[in-house]
Every structure is written in structure tokens, then in C-alpha cells.
């Protein structure tokens, strides 16, 4: 997609050891992020938010360019996000496909500015119709410049977490 050959990243290794750890307790030694936001209401909003999430539109809405081996997030899909000259390679670790929860986690590959994993999911509450987006991540600096930049990297991560949640809210017909 989008002109970049992502096949060279298909054989790239994860640049962290705790692959899949967003399924359980966070491993020690990382910075942690947990954010949630009500993004809509009703089943139509859930479907719209889940589609935006799974088809990379959340990332596009946050201002990133997408280069992916797949049109949507599926296990082992490689996605290289670009922000100007910065390449941010990731691979989908697992997908959540439940009636009231949709999402995926991806892990950082060699060459990513950070090391770690990020889980994105959208939940629908049949009780009250609330659609809530969740972002959970653990990371540490993965390159010399992110180690040197320290707090700047955390601010950038917080900025993009907010942008992701806003993009999912905008995907809904009754955004909050």
C-alpha cells in the first residue's frame, strides 16, 4: 500500500523480548500508557470505530502515512508508519475479534524509534450503548535519539495517543 515496499520488514525481528505481553500484566522496566475515551454511542458507532481502527484509518487520522502488507490489521501484518522522514515499523502480534470488542496489538520491529507493544481496542457496551476506545502500551527507547530525547519521546507518544482517540471519535456518527 501507499508505494513503500514493506516486504523488507517482513523478516525483521521484534526489538523487544516480551512479545504478546499486552494480553496480561505489563513486564518490568518499561514506560506504560493506559488511556480510554468514550468515542460514540450505539452499534453503528461501534462498527464505524472498529472499522477505522482495523483498516488503519485511526493512524491516518492521527497524521501518519500508512504502508502495510495488508489492508487491515491481521496477525503478522507488517505496517510501516511514516512521519516525515521517520519510519516506524511494526508487526501485528494478535487480533481481538469478539462480538463487543475489536482490536489488535502490534509490536515494534528493528528500526523503530521505541521498543515495545501497543494494544488498541474498541468496546461496545450492550447495556448502555457506550463505545469506548482503549490504548494500552509499554515501551522503552529503541534508538539512540529516543534515548537522548527522553521526555520528548513521552510527549510525542502522549500526543499521538490523543490523536488516535480523536480519530476514532471522528469516525463515529455520534462522536463524543
Residue ranges and their predicted role:
Residues 1-83:
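Hydrophobic ligand-binding cavity/cleft-lining segments
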Residues 5-6, 10, 141-176:
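A conserved amphipathic terminal alpha-helix motif
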Residues 35, 135-137, 164:
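A structural signal for short, well-ordered beta-strand segments
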Residues 50-58, 97, 111, 127, ...:
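Short, intrinsically disordered, mixed-charge
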Residues 75, 100-105, 131-136:
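A short hydrophobic beta-strand element
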